[in-house]
């Protein structure tokens, strides 16, 4: 299918041929036309954009109608052209596209310019001669092909690689693994399958004079002298700044490079002068300089210190000292290292189990990684704005998170997103875009991937927030075992192909372009046996290790058997948890953005079909069978542990059920995060927790903690609480009755304090003799460690009624945050009930909420009993978060809570419509 779309460029501007310089035309804007022969429609277009967005704006389609839009990608190639003025006198003219999604054919002045087949690459085309020979007003055409159709065509070709049945994971559109496009565009279990096409990133026309260079890409690599990617850097060594520029234009004669490094906050100059060892390789110029190791202020992640940043300006000159190109990038000085080295004798002596490490170290310090996994924040990247991402990242830091895993296969993040992470101290574990599939290894595919890898590694390498490059998502831990089960005799072939792509190809490309970042071939891995960069396979992976008592690598864990959700004996014991979770419903307010009122029922067709867990496995618009399984899992989770909503009003009942699924999700994540954090002081020396997932791509049941419009689910509030630096946590074996209480700290030095243990009944009255439990326990917890402060058995306690009892755990301590000059106070509160919430003899807490304009805070109080899961909720019209939520509130102890408005208009009327509820309200029939 071909689409013809065109706009005429303005007449060339005459000028004397001696005029030199550079003329760059940004093609962004509204002066484009989108035409489709499939729909026989022509509508106004935009750049950057994608087909669905312009059709939606023109009123042709409704983006909310997901079952229809699934097929638009099959029928809607796109063409766009801007109108602008070009200069006739420049020596060279280039078309530069930062991102075309995905299969595009470009013509200029009716002449074929080139084609693209990779969404993740920057493309540039020399149109100098075409422009000179153009006899009429120049016309630019970009014709986009259907990615699903082209993927299917490739799959049917005689030389297409095939895999055993059942290995490749099809969510909706098949054959995604054959093409270099955002894999989740073909459907995933948390999002739609729109398969958009279009110019999703900015595009330019670049005109150069005789000697000028246009900077396509910049690689600034900052590392300690002698640093090697997979070994811990020596923090006593000076800094090396390696600057490399990729350019368009003639190779300069005897070029030189100069550098100026300024403090981004104060403007003071850290270093300036000529770079040394300047070399030219192809269309890249590279030079280095050395900076005293103590001169720069270090960049630290959130919660560990300041995010000190520097502006680095690189200038390229020719042998006549004429400036040919200049570029400025903001960066920071830090080392970040993924330690996968074998456990040492010293570590064994400390009680750490044998095996290998798997944790991150920042500037030479190991730290506890706290965070989540980020997916594409929208099905259409042109809608992702800086303001929207700033709001999301505010929620990340407010949630006490210091790292996000940038999941494959979405897309490589835009530079402005890394900029935000740099500012806010959010480490970004980044991945190449391969996920839950085996991929071809033919020469053409590998060549395409190589260009993609080099471009993106170089593009983002200057960001101090960059923490890791991983080869792909779950390839080693999921796909290789699936291949072995499906084809045991051919398993060596799939291992060989895996190593050819992720180790023999990608690893050397990463290490050739950065000395500062570690590379791991897969997101979930047991690490490596050894690294030999001169070997054909430079890293020997440790596959399927079963050594008893030894721990290797990181873990992911999903268990939808809700009967064992809170049995921590089922949680994986490892060095680092990089994925775990369970899905829940979004709030009523979010559903109302996407669903008609008559469909606001838990099992309505629209609601069920927006649940893509489990996916259709093909292009089916009536996936009730698989979707119902996921709905059933949420239902069973609620029914097993929480009061079952049964309200007379159908919308209120739907809202209560949505909230109930969020309670289950939040408690499950809390249980696991506490377990993993406690592992910091256990033999496994567990030093990381990244839950699945941070945010939503649309309004639907997913694993997200933040809904599509930015509203926090219960999960994000609970994760914020349990990610505090020092926490107190109960661990209950409900089979044996054993109860243990631990204090866990991620500070870098010991902390001290006390924990009050208070038993009350659900009316709020103290239980006699505190049920035989000590009222106060002192603690000292080591750096990055945990300590047991109390152990008992429920059968040994003097509890009159297990169903009418709750233990309140209140921690008060003192410690020093990393890089802080003085100690500070820490408080944390947790609770424990000896039966699950559904079996509690709940009392009506008689909650009241009021707002004070003077303090700008809400006051919540309970007058009738203990309020469990106290939940403040706000109406539509604004987006933000409460500073505390989903907490326990004792009668007679009012709590003040602020609301942080991120977007929208918080009026007096809006404030008065804030509501409060508790677990009691879940069971009350209105």
Swiss-Prot record:
Repeat as UniProt keyword: no
Active-site annotation: 474 (proton donor)
CC terms in the record's Gene Ontology section: extracellular region
Keywords in alphabetical order: Carbohydrate metabolism, Glycoprotein, Glycosidase, Hydrolase, Polysaccharide degradation, Secreted, Signal
Compartments (UniProt record): Secreted
Primary location group: secreted
Pathway: Glycan metabolism; N-glycan degradation
Reaction(s) catalysed (UniProt annotation): Hydrolysis of terminal, non-reducing beta-D-mannose residues in beta-D-mannosides
GO biological process: glycoprotein catabolic process; polysaccharide catabolic process
Biological role: Exoglycosidase that cleaves the single beta-linked mannose residue from the non-reducing end of beta-mannosidic oligosaccharides of various complexity and length. Involved in the degradation of polymeric mannan and galactomannan.
Subunit structure: Homodimer.
Entry's family note: Belongs to the glycosyl hydrolase 2 family. Beta-mannosidase A subfamily.
The protein's name in its UniProt record: Beta-mannosidase A
Organism name: Aspergillus fumigatus (strain ATCC MYA-4609 / CBS 101355 / FGSC A1100 / Af293) (Neosartorya fumigata)
């Amino acid at each position: 299918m071909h689409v013809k779309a065109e706009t005429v460029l303005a007449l060339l501007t005459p000028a004397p041929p001696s005029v030199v310089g550079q003329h760059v035309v940004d093609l962004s804007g509204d002066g484009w036309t989108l035409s489709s022969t499939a729909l026989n429609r022509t509508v106004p277009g935009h750049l950057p954009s994608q087909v669905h967005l312009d059709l939606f704006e023109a009123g042709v389609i409704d983006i909310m109608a997901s079952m229809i839009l699934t097929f638009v990608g099959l029928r809607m190639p796109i063409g766009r052209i801007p109108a602008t003025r070009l200069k006739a006198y420049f020596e060279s003219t280039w078309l530069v596209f930062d991102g075309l999604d995905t299969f595009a054919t470009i013509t200029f002045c009716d002449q074929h310019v080139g084609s693209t087949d990779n969404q993740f690459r920057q493309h540039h085309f020399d149109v100098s001669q075409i422009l000179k020979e153009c006899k009429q007003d120049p016309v630019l055409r970009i014709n986009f092909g259907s990615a699903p159709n082209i993927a299917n065509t490739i799959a049917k070709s005689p030389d297409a690689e095939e895999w055993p049945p059942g290995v490749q994971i099809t969510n909706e559109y098949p054959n995604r693994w054959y093409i270099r496009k955002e894999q989740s565009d073909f459907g995933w279990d948390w999002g739609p399958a729109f398969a958009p096409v279009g110019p999703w990133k900015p595009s330019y026309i670049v005109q150069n004079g005789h000697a000028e260079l246009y900077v396509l890409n910049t690689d600034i690599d900052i590392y300690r002298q002698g640093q090697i990617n997979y070994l811990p850097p020596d923090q006593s060594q000076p800094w090396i700044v390696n600057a490399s520029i990729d350019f368009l234009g003639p190779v300069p004669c005897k070029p030189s490079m100069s550098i100026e490094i300024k403090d981004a906050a104060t403007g003071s100059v850290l270093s300036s002068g000529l770079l040394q060892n300047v070399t030219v390789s192809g269309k890249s110029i590279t030079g280095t300089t050395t900076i005293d190791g103590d001169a720069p202020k270090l960049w630290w992640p959130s919660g560990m210190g300041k995010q000190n940043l520097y502006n680095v300006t690189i200038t390229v000159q020719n042998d006549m000292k004429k400036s040919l190109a200049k570029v400025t990038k903001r960066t920071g000085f830090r080392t970040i290292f993924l330690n996968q080295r074998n456990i040492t004798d010293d570590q064994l002596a400390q009680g750490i189990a044998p095996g290998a490490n798997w944790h991150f170290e920042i500037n030479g310090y190991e730290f506890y990684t706290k965070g989540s996994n980020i997916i594409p924040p929208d099905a259409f990247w042109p809608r992702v704005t800086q303001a929207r991402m700033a709001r999301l990242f505010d929620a990340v830091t407010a949630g006490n998170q210091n790292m996000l895993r940038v999941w494959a296969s979405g897309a490589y993040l835009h530079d402005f997103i890394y900029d935000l992470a740099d500012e806010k101290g959010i480490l970004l574990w980044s991945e190449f875009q391969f996920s839950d599939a085996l991929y071809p290894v033919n020469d053409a595919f590998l060549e395409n991937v190589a260009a993609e890898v080099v471009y993106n590694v170089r593009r983002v390498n200057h960001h101090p927030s960059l923490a890791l490059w991983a080869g792909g998502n779950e390839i080693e831990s999921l796909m290789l075992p699936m291949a072995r089960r499906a084809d045991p005799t051919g398993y060596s072939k799939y291992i060989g192909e895996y190593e050819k792509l992720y180790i023999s190809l990608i690893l050397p490309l990463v290490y050739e372009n950065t000395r500062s970042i570690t590379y791991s071939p897969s997101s979930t891995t047991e690490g490596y046996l050894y690294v030999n960069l001169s070997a054909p396979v430079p890293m020997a992976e440790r596959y399927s290790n079963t050594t008893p008592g030894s721990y290797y690598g990181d873990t992911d864990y999903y268990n939808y058997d809700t009967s064992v959700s809170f049995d921590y004996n089922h949680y994986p014991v490892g060095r680092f948890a990089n994925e775990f979770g369970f899905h829940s419903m979004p709030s009523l307010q979010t559903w109302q953005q996407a669903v008609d009122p008559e469909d606001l029922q838990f099992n309505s067709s629209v609601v069920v079909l927006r649940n893509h867990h489990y996916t259709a496995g093909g292009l089916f618009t009536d996936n009730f069978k698989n979707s119902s399984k996921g709905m059933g899992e949420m239902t069973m989770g609620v029914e097993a542990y929480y009061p079952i909503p049964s309200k007379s009003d159908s919308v209120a009942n739907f809202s209560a059920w949505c909230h109930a699924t969020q309670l289950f999700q939040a408690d499950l994540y809390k249980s696991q995060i506490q377990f993993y954090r406690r592992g910091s002081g256990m033999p496994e020396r567990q030093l990381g927790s990244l839950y699945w997932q941070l945010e939503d791509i649309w309004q639907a049941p997913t694993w997200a903690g933040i809904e599509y419009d930015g509203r926090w689910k219960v999960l994000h509030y609970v994760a914020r609480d349990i990610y505090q630096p020092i926490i107190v946590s109960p661990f209950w074996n409900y089979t044996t009755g054993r109860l243990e209480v631990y204090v866990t700290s991620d500070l870098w030095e010991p902390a001290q304090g006390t924990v009050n243990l208070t038993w009350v009944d659900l009316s709020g009255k103290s239980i006699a003799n505190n049920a035989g439990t000590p009222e106060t326990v002192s603690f000292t917890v080591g750096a990055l460690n945990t300590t047991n402060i109390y152990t008992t058995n429920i059968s040994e306690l003097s509890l009159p009624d297990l169903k009418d009892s709750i233990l309140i755990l209140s921690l008060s301590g003192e410690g020093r945050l990393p890089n802080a000059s003085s100690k500070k106070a820490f408080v944390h509160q947790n609770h424990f009930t000896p039966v699950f919430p559904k079996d509690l003899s709940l009392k009506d807490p008689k909650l009241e909420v009021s707002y004070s304009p003077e303090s700008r805070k809400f006051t919540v109080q309970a007058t009738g009993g203990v309020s469990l899961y106290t939940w403040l909720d706000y109406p539509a019209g604004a987006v933000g978060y409460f500073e505390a939520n989903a907490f326990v509130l004792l009668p007679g102890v009012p709590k003040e809570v602020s609301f942080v408005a991120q977007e929208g208009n918080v009026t007096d009327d809006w404030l008065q419509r804030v509501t409060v509820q508790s677990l009691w309200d879940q069971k009350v029939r209105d």
